[in-house]
Structures are given as C-alpha cells and as structure tokens.
Regions:
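Membrane-interface interhelical connector segments
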Residues: 34-51
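Extended, low-polarity transmembrane helix blocks
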Residues: 1-35, 53-61, 65, 72-147
Length: 147
C-alpha cells in the first residue's frame, strides 16, 4: 500500500508544480511563526476562527512539513492532502465574505493564489512527485536525469 502511495509517473514537468506548491506552503508556514499577528493567530482571530493561537501553530506546522515534503518529492501525495484541506478552508473562510460584499470578480482576483495552490495540490495528489522525486527512488523506479 505504501509503495502505491509513493508510485509516480515519469513526468519531467511535475517538478515545476512541486517546487511552486512546496515553496509557497513552506514560506507561508514560516511566516505564521515569524509574523503571528498578521499571518498566524492574529489573522485567524480577525476572521473569527476558534482557538486562533492553537490553529495558527497547527496550520503553520502542517504548511512547513508539507512544503518540505513536497519540495523533496517525498510522500508527495500524502503531503498534498493537508495543503488541499488548508486551501479549501482558506477559500471558504476568507473569500466568501469578499464574494458577498464585493462580487465574483473581486473574489476571483483576491483568491487567485489560493486557487493555484488548490489546483496544484490536487494535481500532486493525482500524479505524485514525478520523475525527479524521492518517491520515485524509494519505489525502485528508475530515474535518469536526461531530458
């Protein structure tokens, strides 16, 4: 079962999505600890989420761990599941008010990064880490570094 979760295709371009998604989540997670009043607990309190102190640290830790795993291509599918959930919650909690008050186009403009990360996470869950990932090495799939 673990081998099936780590199994990936031979796609050479998956690394682009993996690096983008991993870097964004790693950066966002670090910011939740470095700037808690504007990126972590303070932000969660402002939008009305319960227990913002715990939630800020919890989400930040998941973003850091998932971001690192995705960057490495290690347990990529599993690491992308928390990022998918984080993005669904982020869109539902922060963008629904914008949609209601400012309209569809303002909401779409304000959530373009959220949608990109959501779709990137879905892609990684479906495809895995790609040709240049630790997942591929751990499953014994042969990786060549030629183009």
């Amino acid at each position: 079962m673990i081998k099936q979760l780590l199994q990936t295709d031979d796609s050479k371009t998956t690394i682009i999505i993996r690096l983008m998604v991993g870097a964004v989540f790693l950066s966002e997670g670090i910011q939740k600890f470095l700037l808690p009043t504007i990126r972590g607990a303070g932000r969660f309190e402002k939008i009305g989420l319960p227990n913002p102190e715990f939630l800020g640290s919890f989400v930040g830790a998941f973003e850091i761990i998932s971001g690192i795993l995705i960057l490495l291509g290690l347990a990529t599918r599993l690491a992308a599941i928390p990022t998918l959930i984080i993005m669904l919650v982020a869109i539902a909690t922060t963008k629904s008010e914008v949609l209601q008050n400012e309209g569809f186009w303002s909401m779409m403009h304000g959530s373009r990064t959220d949608w990109s990360m959501l779709l990137g996470s879905i892609y990684l869950i479906i495809r895995g880490g790609g040709k240049w990932s630790l997942d591929r090495n751990l499953t014994g799939q042969r990786t060549t570094f030629g183009v």
